Amino acid sequence: MINIVVLGSMNTDLVMRTKICPSGGETIHGEPDGFSTGNGGKGANQAVAVARLSNPADTKVSMLGCVGDDAFGVEMLSGLKKDGVNVDNVKKIENKSTGVAMIIVEETGENRILLSEGANGNVDTAFVKAMEQRISTCNLLIMQLEIPLEAVEIALQIAHKHGVDVLMNPAPAIPLSHDMISYCAYLVPNEHEAAILLNQADSPATLENVDAYASKLLSFGVRKAVIITLGSQGAYYKSANGESALVSACKVKAVDTTAAGDTFIGAFSNSIAHGQPLKDSLEFAAKCSAITVQRKGAASSIPSLLEVDGSFNLKKNT
């Protein structure tokens, strides 16, 4: 049995769809029936992605984090359980609201997100230290940066102490110390996050510079591989043993990119945790993300393994 643990955020998504975003001081109409709510947060989305894209007979997925004592928290726990995610170590915080993300999705599928952390702010160092036994026994720990940074740092140290591989998705993007990066087995930023990690925020990764960016991030001590996602251009990887390649994205019409990155992380994590080759795992992740972007919603857009297995007509960009 492969044990995958996700430590991270859980948010309720409040989504508004619109042809274009309003400018400052401007009021516009969104799409008719364009408002929806649903479970989200990078942590929860990635846990759901791992669960839906794995076989429950050989994979256990657990969520670590906090929700508020409100209706959003109840719905979050119910949704995670329904997807087969273990929530025994999700803590309900009294007199706190569950995290909220306000998401504006344009006609092109591009999105803008505003976060209110709520109970996610209670995922502190004390919480993480109390989870040491759970972290120490997993095969892979997945983390993002929607919880307090000091909690992420402690979790990295615990995982390192027990020889547990960590996949870090450094989003939302903030600078990280070289020590923190060196505790990661897999570092998976997008083009903007990679630039911020390298203190080059004005120069996002492109096809022309992505190899140099990946090499520099590897030099900080990433143990196995750096994967830089490039949106519709795919993902570039470079491993510690020198292997590198661009894995093309699948050619589809995007409707909503909100959960594309989280689907990619979940799919890749499940595949690599089960011992699949790096490139094969990334190709699987690209296929899963291509299905996600053709649907509206966050967690609701993440496909199941059965759906992915049945989608053989996706073409790669050339």
Swiss-Prot record:
Activity regulation text: Activated by a monovalent cation that binds near, but not in, the active site. The most likely occupant of the site in vivo is potassium. Ion binding induces a conformational change that may alter substrate affinity.
State the InterPro entries in the record: Carboh/pur_kinase_PfkB_CS (IPR002173), PfkB_dom (IPR011611), Ribo/fructo_kinase (IPR002139), Ribokinase (IPR011877), Ribokinase-like (IPR029056)
For this protein, what is the EC number?
Answer: 2.7.1.15
Binding locations of substrate: N11, T12, D13, G41, K42, G43, A44, N45, E146, D262
Which GO terms fall under molecular function for this chain's record? ATP binding; metal ion binding; ribokinase activity
Source domain of life is Eukaryota
Q: Does the keyword DNA damage apply?
A: no
The record's annotation in CDD domains points to: ribokinase
Name its co-factor(s).
Answer: Mg(2+)
Q: Which residues form a coiled coil?
A: none
Picking any one GO biological process from the record gives:
D-ribose catabolic process
Main location group: cytoplasm
Instruction: State the compartments where it is located.
Output: Cytoplasm; Nucleus
Q: One GO cellular component from the entry?
A: cytosol
HAMAP family membership: Ribokinase (MF_01987)
* Quaternary structure and interacting proteins, as annotated: Homodimer.
Family as reported in the entry's similarity comment: Belongs to the carbohydrate kinase PfkB family. Ribokinase subfamily.
Entries under PANTHER family matching the protein: RIBOKINASE (PTHR10584:SF166), SUGAR KINASE (PTHR10584)
Name of the protein: Ribokinase
Task: Tell me which species this is from.
Answer: Schizosaccharomyces pombe (strain 972 / ATCC 24843)
